[in-house]
Amino acid sequence: MLTFWHWKWLGIKNTEFKCVKGKLYLSPIKDLFNNEIIAYDLVRSPNSEQITQMMKQAVARLAGAKPILHSDQGWQYQMIGYQNILRENGI
């Protein structure tokens, strides 16, 4: 059963994987309390839509929780769409 008390701190970091047929980009959100993956998206080319989809998954799963989200300052996290999702959901 999921509980809100451990969703106080979440971490986010894009990771590039080199594969036989090219690169893959993983964008997960991890609960820093128990290392559970809250949401993720995997794409062949990094783009702002990847971050938007991952954040929509996270918001649906958090169901009203308002955690603190740690991320680097990469270009994906500077996009207005990403920042709007955070603002609209009190994250």
UniProtKB/Swiss-Prot annotation:
<dbReference type="InterPro" id="IPR001584">
    <property type="entry name" value="Integrase_cat-core"/>
</dbReference>
<dbReference type="InterPro" id="IPR012337">
    <property type="entry name" value="RNaseH-like_sf"/>
</dbReference>
<dbReference type="Pfam" id="PF00665">
    <property type="entry name" value="rve"/>
</dbReference>
<feature type="domain" description="Integrase catalytic">
    <location>
        <begin position="1"/>
        <end position="91"/>
    </location>
</feature>
<dbReference type="InterPro" id="IPR036397">
    <property type="entry name" value="RNaseH_sf"/>
</dbReference>
<dbReference type="GO" id="GO:0015074">
    <property type="term" value="P:DNA integration"/>
</dbReference>
<dbReference type="GO" id="GO:0003676">
    <property type="term" value="F:nucleic acid binding"/>
</dbReference>
<protein>
    <recommendedName>
        <fullName>Uncharacterized protein HI_1280</fullName>
    </recommendedName>
</protein>
